[in-house]
Amino acid sequence: MVPFEAEKFEPYMKTVVRPWLQDHVEDGQFPGWDGKLIHFYRAKNPSPKGIIVMLHGFCGFFGKYHEVLYNFYEEGYSIYFLELRSHGLSYRPVSSPSMVDVGDFDEYVEDLKSFLDTIVIPDQTETSDLPDYTALPLFLYAHSMGGCIATLFLEKYPDIFQAAVLSSPMIDINFGSTPRWKVNLTALGTKLLGWNDRYVPGQGDFDGKPYFEESGASCRERYDYSFRLRLAPESQGANTMNGSSCRWARASLRAIRRLWKDKSSLTMPLLILQAGKDTYVDNQAENRLRNEVRNALLIRFPEAKHEIFNSEGKTLEKYYKVIFRFLDQYADA
């Protein structure tokens, strides 16, 4: 495990995790639901007790989850990380590397289904030097926007994953003091005006400056690590996502409505991890989901901001203990 203490984080990442990434992680591409190329990363554990498929959040990319992936691997899991379309090295429907754009969240859902069908499941049966994975439990770990996508996927395909961990899931968006009617009216206005691949008002291109205080991280060292990866010349701007198109924003509102409409399909065990100081997603919506679906457990982290995995100390220690205790119930079943 990467040390939880902030002062030990960077040395450990430099001397242990970065070399491990070079030796154990490989990447590739596969055709998404529409044939567009989607990027992924994988780390195959030689003695796995389960498989974890990871979905990142809005404007996320692989480098932001190096620590999470390493810790999951060290705990005995094989990891498959999907870089969602319009993020990282995956297909971009618009020219700006800073803009996240999608027509409908079902595109994400079907990309995940394609990922499972073409990479994850075949990978387990075609690799002769690894044990037979077909009997291993399959888990889903998803953060924020990934949590919304995961929930939609689990509603549409309820029999694939044994259990899911939703970390600060975007069950609804936190709009602060802005009333929902005004949000919906603005979304309708952008549609009537034909604003599709234009930024949502108030958002724009990545400016190359750090904004730690406004970020979802509470550990400066962890924030700085992923921010440096955003700036890395070798990434050629692939990690500079910074805002959404109006089309993506409308799609997100539709996805949230659909999520609630189909919630009765959520029957598999769910672990909802809630950040007490979250200003990005709506905690009350997470509470409601916990109350309205079967087999849902919610654990709150009072001092955490949106990215609980970018906390430190006791909060981060609790985060991983809760996740592994939950997954181990089904990995050992």
Located regions from the model:
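An N-terminal hydrophobic leader/cap segment in hydrolases
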Residues: 1-31, 37-44
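Active-site glycine-rich loops that stabilize anionic/oxyanionic intermediates
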Residues: 57-60
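Conserved alpha/beta-hydrolase
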Residues: 62, 69-95
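Alpha/beta-hydrolase active-site loop
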Residues: 100-126
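Alpha/beta-hydrolase-fold enzymes
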Residues: 145, 149-240
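Short beta-strand/loop motif that positions the catalytic acidic residue
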Residues: 266, 272-274, 278
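Short alpha-helix in the alpha/beta-hydrolase fold that links the catalytic acid
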Residues: 268, 282-291
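Catalytic active-site module of serine/aspartate enzymes centered on a nucleophile-bearing elbow/loop
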Residues: 297, 302-333
